[in-house]
From Swiss-Prot:
CDD domains: Ribosomal_L1. It comes from Rhodococcus opacus (strain B4). The keyword rRNA-binding applies. Coiled coil: none annotated. Signal peptide: none annotated. GO terms for biological process: regulation of translation; translation. Residues 227-238 have a biased composition (Basic and acidic residues). Binds directly to 23S rRNA. The L1 stalk is quite mobile in the ribosome, and is involved in E site tRNA release. Protein L1 is also a translational repressor protein, it controls the translation of the L11 operon by binding to its mRNA. The gene is rplA. This is Large ribosomal subunit protein uL1. One of its GO terms (molecular function) is tRNA binding. Belongs to the universal ribosomal protein uL1 family. InterPro entries: Ribosom_uL1_bac-type, Ribosomal_uL1, Ribosomal_uL1-like, Ribosomal_uL1/biogenesis, Ribosomal_uL1_3-a/b-sand, Ribosomal_uL1_CS.
Length: 238
């Protein structure tokens, strides 16, 4: 097990790990326990009661965070002609087709999201093994395979995030920065939680949201009441 820093251990002493905090309490405490001198990212981890090995229990989706992530995502677009021009006008960080594919094959991965027009997907498939494991492969289900590249770029730049359950039935996503107001962090959390609840597979049995923790990148995970899905801005325990 990795040795924890003194700053982390001091921060962890402020957390009662036997308690389930309200989302607002957790947001406040996450900011207080950040051991980073930078504007730390606030993250959420959710354990779901699903079996990701079963195709009908794969949970994935997208959500537009009302207050963004605090970071402007770097977006690339696979497109040609008029659609390429639209993507550039929308603010895409890189636009291309074969040239962009070759660049990625050469090891370039300095971007956070990839969009493709439908006609380019056959070509993009050649780098699926590179993009897929990193969660960067364009997919119609996440709105990243589309002819409306202007909207797709704007959505991602504006705070649209993707979530996908991993092999251990966990979801990880960002809800903002430590500099955000507590209420904005909670409202972002609420928007993501609503979408996760809507994505519940009909075949999932038992408790769906089993565990939730909120933390900054360098801080301890703060346990959140997984049953608290309404009145999230209330400070009191559920």
């Amino acid at each position: 097990m990795a040795k924890r820093s003194k700053a982390y251990l001091a921060a962890a002493e402020k957390v009662d790990f036997d308690k389930l905090y309200s989302p607002l309490q957790a947001a406040k405490l996450a900011k207080e326990t950040s051991s980073s001198k930078m504007d730390a990212t606030v993250e959420v981890a959710v354990r779901l009661g699903v079996d990701p090995r079963k195709a009908d229990q794969m949970v994935r989706g997208t959500v537009n965070l009302p207050h963004g992530t605090g970071k402007t995502a770097r977006v690339i677009v696979f497109a040609v002609g008029e659609k390429a021009a639209e993507a550039e006008a929308a603010g895409a960080d890189a636009v291309g087709a074969e040239d962009l594919i070759e660049r990625i094959q050469g090891g370039w991965l300095d971007f956070d999201a990839a969009i493709a027009t439908p006609d380019q997907m056959a070509k993009v498939g050649r780098i699926a093994r590179v993009l897929g494991p990193r969660g960067l492969m364009p997919n119609p289900k996440t709105g990243t395979v589309t002819a409306d590249v202007t909207k797709a770029v704007a959505d991602i730049k504006g705070g649209k995030i993707n979530f996908r359950v991993d092999k251990q039935a966990n979801l990880h996503f960002v809800i903002g920065k430590a500099s955000f107001d507590d209420a904005k962090l909670v409202e972002n959390y609420g928007a993501a939680l609503d979408e996760i609840l809507r994505a519940k597979p009909s075949s999932a049995k038992g408790r769906y949201v089993k565990k939730v923790t909120v933390s900054t990148t360098t801080g301890p995970g703060i346990p959140v009441d997984p049953n608290r899905t309404r009145n999230l801005l209330e400070d009191a325990d559920a």
